[in-house]
Amino acid sequence: MQKQSTTMLSDLPKDVAEEVLSKFPVTSLRRVRFTCKKLNTLSKDMSFTRKHIDKEEAKKKQSKEFHVVMMLDFRVSLFSLNLLNPNPIERLGQLVSLDGGAQVDISNIFHCEGFLLCTTKDISRVVVWNPCVGQTIWIKPRNSFNKWDRYALGYDVMKNHKVLRFVDDGEYGRRHLLCEFEIYSFESDSWEVLDVNPDWEIDFVHRGLSIDGNSYWFARDKVVPYGGQDPSYFLLCFDFTTERFRPPLPLPFQPYFGDTVALSSVGDNQIAVLCQRSSSPYTLKIWISSKVEPNAVSWNKLFLKVDMKPLTGNSFSYSGGSFFVDEEKKMAVVLDKNIGGGFDPTRNIAYIIGKEGYFKKVDLGESRHL
């Protein structure tokens, strides 16, 4: 009797191995890494991660469900959103520790196609993390990190990933107290100083987002203090191929002092912008782009407009917060904090807002991050 040969997963060609790995759910990939060296290497591959995420998202779209990564109370968790369910937002679990040991408090995250750039609460470390497979790359500073640092993760046309770090603590027309712009290349494992003298500024609370490898922020003109001139607000792009900031891009609105503003990504290559007025009736408006490129942006008609006074009685607590939109259902999910009074704790709240008065408030639990 002829002995049958056994084909191991590690013997398969790369394209076949990719197809096999893509059948595993994201939550199982970390265990798969320990089966063999080849699968471990493949599961860490950035192109494979992108393909795996695309397949997962296609499955979720068919089931009217999608997953989002959110940071609550210095922890990064995976949530399931299905706005048709009685319980529309469900925490699936906290993502594993970055270093495999004690939990690390995270102060900020920046997402780029399945990868998270995280900064620690104690400002001592910066890490790029693939939560699907547990891969981490800790990045050492050129000199030192600063508590006012802003970061972005992106890639150039050759798919070389890079990290932008910048801090601009100064006023227009005056001496800069601290102004540093530098970029880290994973390919060379080194930092390079960029020559940037900005006439714009980005508020520290405004986090950027990644579209097609480039990063976008809410920004405004840097004006002379008490000069009597109101700044203009715009969208600002950092191009990771040219390693330069591009000229300002127009917004579909101009905010006033005290208004709540935020950015969110829609799909793989569009941007949503939110603006809520700070005066009654606290009107909330959301627009979605029709085209986004480093040197051009155009906006569709208004996606959602809701007077929030009858629903919440006031405006949201802070600018730069997170929100998501569901284009198909014409709904938005806005994350905020309900500040407790007296001995009442502050709570993390999600507001689900839709057309024709649809409104639902979801309590995500007590907050220890005020």
UniProtKB/Swiss-Prot annotation:
Source organism, top-level taxon: Eukaryota
F-box domain mapped to chain residues: 6-52
InterPro entries: F-box-assoc_dom_typ1 (IPR006527), F-box-assoc_interact_dom (IPR017451), F-box-like_dom_sf (IPR036047), F-box_dom (IPR001810), Gal_Oxase/kelch_b-propeller (IPR011043), SCF_F-box_component (IPR050796)
Pfam families: F-box (PF00646), FBA_1 (PF07734)
NCBIfam families reported in the protein's UniProt record: F_box_assoc_1
Descriptive protein name: F-box protein At2g18780
Protein source organism: Arabidopsis thaliana
